[in-house]
């Protein structure tokens, strides 16, 4: 029998969202939050603008890109991008994990954009990136949060593309190197990677996206909470911290603290190094394991932050129901032993384990 290990992680929180807080986090960091004040007050606006400015600074986002704080986490941000920006041309939808497949469903069944192409593949691989028609708009997840498979870089996106690129980067920012020149609408949430609180999203728009917003009106109605233009002009206030609905100023303070921590360790390059280091430890263990393997089949596409593991050898011969039961049993055991929390993969993904790595 295998001897029970004695060493345990210093941090037990491996959830992929909400993710663990940064090292040394304490509720005391919230003492300067703008509580009981309107988010429209000078103090509230200042806090929101600080959050936007720090986001730009720490992700090195170009000055001519707009950054907005929007409702409903990354889901709200990517839906806002889709409902405002898509429809002027067909869409190339790339989907290889749970959330990308959700965005595929939106384009195919809700927006019903004619002429669209669906590059849908199974968990563990990504579509052929060199079969994409860039005369069309593109939507993709940079990092597959539920499959552990990411795009290797942005080299496959041409500079002279005609369509827009919409990128769900919610578990990629601060963990992987994004090329902003290749991205026209990029989204993420505070709860992923940074360990922020839920319900708030970030929408980043390129000049090309802004130009389309001001010159194109979708054929479908846009709900008030999604509207980014008025009289065919960008609502600039959204990108100065004048949010479309009321944000939690407590969550804003927490997000600012997370960004200040990123700054203290060298910006996003520092968090990438941290994620890479943590991933190297997991990879060494997986390479030596006789019962788990990476769900992602390609070394080039292995995620360093949303690590998804499948069962191998005899365990892989179990049916799906039994594999899911086994994953839950492992999750419960590690929870009860206070070794790891929240490591069972998403219910819509193949059975296995999932670990989020940056702060750990």
Question: What is the role of each PLM region?
Answer:
Residues 1-42:
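N-terminal "arm"/small-domain region of PLP-dependent enzymes with the aminotransferase-like
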Residues 191-283:
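Active-site C-terminal subdomain of aminotransferase-like
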Residues 122-174, 185:
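Active-site phosphate-binding strand-loop segment of PLP-dependent enzymes
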Residues 76, 84-138:
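PLP-dependent aminotransferase-like
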Residues 359-360:
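Conserved small/polar residues in nucleotide/adenosyl-binding loops
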Residues 54-62, 260-296, 333:
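Conserved PLP-dependent catalytic core of the aminotransferase class-I/II
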Residues 293-333:
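Conserved PLP-binding catalytic core of the aspartate aminotransferase-like
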Residues 28-80, 84, 96-98, 102, ...:
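Conserved N-terminal alpha-helix of the aminotransferase class I/II PLP-enzyme fold
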